């Protein structure tokens, strides 16, 4: 039985990447040792991480005046690192909230700086409203938002207008899923465990002029200047996770880069949303313009049926479809590594389940 993993994270990884890692596990680059065993400051590992950054920069066409850091602590760590590094001049920040994770980031930031919070969802709806904040953004050290909320399946495609202010984005769940203009952002950060690789690595893209202004009490592990000067290795990094990310970057380049992945992601999501829209049995309540390409949420008419759906889907090899405890229902996370065959298998099961239970 073929298994498709719809987990929101840690998520499905490209099969060819896992197969390469399997082949190299005991003998990496003919050294007779695993990549997990070599020195993180050794010649081969340093060459690997240098190439990984080059590949990542190529994928996103990252301008030269941006640093790329490979850190630890996940996006939650960055919830604290962002204000410690950036909230240093005006003493207050603006958080645009659209769901659980953007609200959680705002809550953490309040430990370090004054936070103004604006809920950008329209009243009672999973729909994003006005995104022009250029008239107020200049009074803040930065403006923070989360372009994809995994729990509700809300994605913000348009970049908020903040004028000349610093825009910060938590792209943990949609990084590398579509093309973006990096120059519109001051900082982009993302946990790896959805589209970049396994859990353990956090990528931070930060504009150079924003480095070097951390408050003095900022721990060195979160200080962008210190990490940048030390190649993201002031401590021993999660070497195996970094290695796997490097393989994912090469895989994405071989597929044609982000442009091709975005095309495939739109195709996958359209298949699933089109099926949901024609069904009276399943429901998705996100406004069409804000439907996530990465996390598709849906439900039946009652919790009992939802539980039955998840159990029977799991038995059929369609794993991790249970929705987040905050929202319930079901959630199909269809990141870059999910093949279109997985979407078709899910739709086939959904059609069968509807016929048997409607």
UniProtKB/Swiss-Prot annotation:
This is Phosphoserine aminotransferase. The modification N6-(pyridoxal phosphate)lysine is found at residue 194. PANTHER family: PHOSPHOSERINE AMINOTRANSFERASE. CDD domains: PSAT_like. One of its GO terms (molecular function) is O-phospho-L-serine:2-oxoglutarate aminotransferase activity. It is found in: Cytoplasm. Its cofactor is pyridoxal 5'-phosphate. Pyridoxal 5'-phosphate binds at residues 75-76, 101, 150, 170, 193, 235-236. Disulfide bonds: none annotated. Pfam families: Aminotran_5. It comes from Histophilus somni (strain 129Pt). L-glutamate binds at residue 41. Its EC number is 2.6.1.52. Binds 1 pyridoxal phosphate per subunit. It catalyses: O-phospho-L-serine + 2-oxoglutarate = 3-phosphooxypyruvate + L-glutamate; 4-(phosphooxy)-L-threonine + 2-oxoglutarate = (R)-3-hydroxy-2-oxo-4-phosphooxybutanoate + L-glutamate. GO terms for biological process: L-serine biosynthetic process; pyridoxine biosynthetic process. GO terms for cellular component: cytoplasm. Pathway: Amino-acid biosynthesis; L-serine biosynthesis; L-serine from 3-phospho-D-glycerate: step 2/3; Cofactor biosynthesis; pyridoxine 5'-phosphate biosynthesis; pyridoxine 5'-phosphate from D-erythrose 4-phosphate: step 3/5.
